């Protein structure tokens, strides 16, 4: 087995020291992929065909984190929660490298560009594109089918059918990629 491609399955995902079993309510679907170095801490749900990539950290300390079916959290992302602010990703969501999500909700088939930040109480609709490097401030609502970017992010226009299809392609690509990594680990 190639150590650089070694992933962590639901069976061997380690509980970090000091995380406390009283909040360890992890539910990891057998088809979910967790790459080596990723940390899944406390109250986190990984649904069917979801994936969490290298060195990402998901900390469901005070509330739950849900990674929806077919969604992917790419390398070096941080997902956290706040009091009464769970983080919920719908189906087919792509979270780009180095992104920080904190107590927010993201709708189905949405792309969050690399190095973006989404804060407590923010709600991103379905079929959205959040441009790389964007900041979605506390409590901001981005409606379905929107393209938004900037610091702070502003809605620029509606997404095109081609962009919606691209979001689906990205999510499907990571489902296939995770399957290849999982197979390489056998």
PLM feature segments, named:
Residues 18-28, 61-69, 75-77, 81-82, ...:
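Glycine-rich hexapeptide-repeat left-handed beta-helix
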Residues 22-52:
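N-terminal segments that cap or nucleate solenoid repeat domains
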Residues 1-4:
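Methionine residue identity
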């Amino acid at each position: 087995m190639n150590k650089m491609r070694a992933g962590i399955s639901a069976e061997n995902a380690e509980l970090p020291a000091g995380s406390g079993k009283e909040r360890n309510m992890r539910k990891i679907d057998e088809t979910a992929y967790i790459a080596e170095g990723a940390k899944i801490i406390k109250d986190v749900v990984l649904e069917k065909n979801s994936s969490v990539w290298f060195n990402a950290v998901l900390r469901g300390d005070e509330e739950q984190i849900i990674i929806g079916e077919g969604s992917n959290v790419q390398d070096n992302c941080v997902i956290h929660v706040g009091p009464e602010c769970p983080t919920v990703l719908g189906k087919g969501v792509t979270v780009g490298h180095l992104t920080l999500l904190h107590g927010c909700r993201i709708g189905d088939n949405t792309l969050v560009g690399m190095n973006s930040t989404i804060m407590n109480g923010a709600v991103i609709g379905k079929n959205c594109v959040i441009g790389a490097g964007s900041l979605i401030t506390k409590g901001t609502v981005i409606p379905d089918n929107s393209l938004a970017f900037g610091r702070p992010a502003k809605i620029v226009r509606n997404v095109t059918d081609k962009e919606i299809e691209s979001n689906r392609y990205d999510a499907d690509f990571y489902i296939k990629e995770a399957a290849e990594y999982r197979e390489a680990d056998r």
